[in-house]
Design a protein with these regions (language model features):
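Predominantly soluble domains enriched in secretory-pathway, periplasmic, or organellar proteins
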Residues: 1-179
Length: 179
C-alpha cells in the first residue's frame, strides 16, 4: 500500500512522464505518461487526485487511491499552458479544477472529478499601466483560495490578477486587481 502522506511527484521531463516516489524507501511506486514538459503537479484537497499539466496544455488527472495509481481523465485545454489548480475551500473540495493557458489566452473551469469543461473565460484585455489592448496575455500561476470558493489567476502581460469566485458558476464573478 502506498503511503500518500509521504509520496512525491517528480517530473520526468524528457520521458514525458510523472513518477510517484515513496518518500520512505525512495523508490518509484508508479509512473504515468503525461503531456509534453510537465510544468506543475498539484494535489487535490482530498488527496485523491494529482493533477499535472504540460506545456502542451494537456492535463492528466491521476487517481492516487487506486491500487496502482493511474491516469483516469485527461483533457487538452489549449495549445500552451503552465498551471492547473483544484478547489480547496470547505464544501468545494475537489469540486473544480482550473487551468490557465498561454494560448489561447484563457482559463478553463472544469469538474474536479472528471475534467469535464464547465466554463471558459477569455483573458484578453487592457493593460493596467498604459490602458492598451493586449490580444495575447498569458495565464501564469493559479492558486486556490482556502477561505472562499475562488481562484486567484495571474494574467501576465495585462498586469492583472483575477479573482474568479465559483460560488455560482452560471453567474461567475471575476474581480480584477491591478498589480
Amino acid at each position: 500500500k502506498i503511503n500518500l502522506e509521504n509520496l512525491f511527484s517528480v517530473t520526468l521531463r524528457d520521458a514525458g512522464e510523472v513518477a510517484l516516489i515513496d518518500g520512505a524507501c525512495k523508490k518509484i511506486v508508479a509512473s504515468s505518461k503525461t503531456g509534453h514538459a510537465v510544468h506543475i503537479s498539484r494535489m487535490s484537497a482530498s488527496g485523491r487526485y494529482l493533477f499535472v499539466i504540460g506545456r502542451d496544455a494537456k492535463i492528466d488527472m491521476i487517481d492516487l487511491w487506486m491500487e496502482k495509481p493511474a491516469v483516469v481523465a485527461e483533457i487538452k485545454v489549449g495549445l500552451e499552458a503552465r498551471s492547473v489548480e483544484t478547489s480547496k475551500y470547505k464544501g468545494f473540495e475537489d469540486k473544480y479544477a482550473v487551468a490557465g493557458t498561454y494560448w489561447p489566452p484563457q482559463f478553463v473551469i472544469m469538474k474536479g472529478d472528471s475534467l469535464e469543461p464547465l466554463k471558459i473565460v477569455a483573458t484578453r484585455g487592457m493593460t493596467v499601466d498604459t490602458q492598451e489592448y493586449h490580444p495575447e496575455p498569458r495565464v501564469a500561476a493559479i492558486v486556490a483560495n482556502h477561505h472562499k470558493p475562488e481562484f486567484v489567476v495571474n494574467v501576465k502581460e495585462t498586469g492583472k490578477v483575477l479573482m474568479a469566485n465559483c460560488s455560482f458558476l452560471n453567474n461567475l464573478k471575476v474581480t480584477e486587481i491591478a498589480t
